[in-house]
């Protein structure tokens, strides 16, 4: 492995860590801005100044001007000295069904231009039959083995298989045997585009909780502020987003809890400009793109702070109440993945639990604590409810904590 991954803090199955590669470091969870190498709504220098020291661009698009890129090298070509990851063209394969490049060619090209992290030409299987997805997975695994023999960059090990969980687990089993640097879960974008977040949680939630913690996990195509906290809590470390730029072209404004159209806003500020003022400005696409990327940066940085404070579940549940698709995805996770989640939970935490209704009562850390409480002699319970975590620190306003917890002990 070329990457060194060190975990510093944990909460739920989420973790704050550091990835070190080629003398460069990123702190996880981390979001890679997706860069169009030939047309940038937001210049790369500004992205760097905003605190992003790793980006993703597309090797398949770069290949169309391969002589120039190979001559300069990817870092000089883009003017970026941080970690550069290249995607292989798998997204274009998902969109268009076919691309005019072979796996061997894209691996060789990524070697020649000097990427830090690279990808194989894996095959997404969204919308395919089980047998088709199985065949695609076999090809993907063969391509990965070929790439490992060729690549001089840190390599992602793709875990494909679409909705077929046994295929996803087969991919994980095979990929974990190989000398890869990052577990990369693909085939996510179609679910994101259709807001099928509960379906996504059912497909990749169990998988995330079973992935070994020795290497970071990248959820390709997932990078919305409303959704990231839940999947961090399940164990994801890396995300990426082109939405900051794509949304800007459509005059869509990212916020931590939902996306708005510029035409529907009046008094809200986007950077230093009122929405009513921004509507008539020539450079509004640039301003919105910068605003959107700042929202994403602040979100991922805030998530890291919440993990350090042991408040990640509080935030996941706050987010769940912002949209039905997130609510039911969160409820599914808490109801059905408890046995896996509790294996990752810290035994005690620095802060109390914020009561927010039924989802709070389903939290894996609280359920585990109640399980342990039930094993005690009744004479010990009152003292435990007064002082022990999480009961003594439970944040429930003016309600009587003992009466609240007694109903769980019947």
Curated annotation (Swiss-Prot):
Record's GO cellular component terms: cytoplasm
Active-site feature positions: 87 (nucleophile)
Cofactor remark from the record: Binds 1 zinc ion per subunit.
Disulphide bonds in the chain: none
EC code: 2.4.2.48
Homology family: Belongs to the archaeosine tRNA-ribosyltransferase family.
Record-given protein name: tRNA-guanine(15) transglycosylase
